[in-house]
Amino acid sequence: MQALLNEILDAVRPLIGQGKVADYIPALGTVPANQLGIAVYGNDGEMYCAGDAETPFSVQSISKVFSLVQAIEHSGEAIWERLGHEPSGQPFNSLVQLEFERGRPRNPFINAGALVICDINQSRFAAPALSMRDFVRRLSGNPQVMVDGKVADSEYQHRARNAAMAYLMQSFGNFHNDVEAVLRSYFSHCALRMNCIDLARAFCFLANDGFCKHSGEQILTRRQTQQVNSIMATSGLYDEAGNFAYRVGLPGKSGVGGGIVAVVPGQFTVCVWSPELNTAGNSLAGMAALEMLSSRIGWSVF
């Protein structure tokens, strides 16, 4: 496995320079583009990594999985009364579809859906941002995971579209807490700094029927784990979920910080990171690395 990871990074490294680092969040636009890392974590507890796997980065939308899991853990099936689990077919920050469907987001991985999930968690936790940070520390086994305050503030200052979605949902009765407070929590989640090793470990319960081996916790039931993985497979990569299924064939979740996490049910979790994005907002080199890894080992679930 170690030799294969080194070989794959060497093969995809020439793609660096062909994408673009996210700059609509100013604090992300300063990240050096020439970075590439990968980590593979097995259900047997073995970790394999290569490249810049220990370099922390902003998880961004990858955090939506953690928020969803928290909501399921504490609120159960009731969350699905407020949002769906269908692909949207629209941009992740679309207002048009949200209004047409009367404030009920299609799934928890578009921004509107993630905001509803944060609203649910805001009602459940006294300090949602701290609860999320501590939850992720527990899942990753890394007590040093922190929120990047500069990134969180940068996102809050450019919150107009997310605020518009929240207020629109509030007008339809599907948003119950103070919008600004929920946005603060949401951006705090997105601004978590983790590396490939942290994320591969943090997602391991999704490859193991909901059981986190290194913390000894049953995070989700087997059925709930299947449900989260299925939504990742259909909606986890913005408008490129179909292409990811075609090329990689695994449940996955990406973020504009350049990270992608993929789950091999029953076997492994993988995190790859390279900050340059393709036109769909997913890591260009990261997609290629995951495609090569899945193809070489035969991991596709299809």
UniProtKB/Swiss-Prot annotation:
InterPro entries linked: Beta-lactam/transpept-like, Glutaminase
Binding, substrate: 61, 111, 155, 162, 186, 238, 256
Keywords in alphabetical order: Hydrolase
GO molecular function: glutaminase activity
GO terms (BP aspect): glutamate biosynthetic process; glutamine catabolic process
Catalytic activity field: L-glutamine + H2O = L-glutamate + NH4(+)
E.C. number(s) listed in UniProt: 3.5.1.2
Pfam families associated with the record: Glutaminase
First-level EC class: hydrolase
Subunit text: Homotetramer.
Membership in a protein family: Belongs to the glutaminase family.
HAMAP family: Glutaminase (MF_00313)
Protein's name in the database: Glutaminase
Species in which this protein is naturally found: Pseudomonas fluorescens (strain Pf0-1)
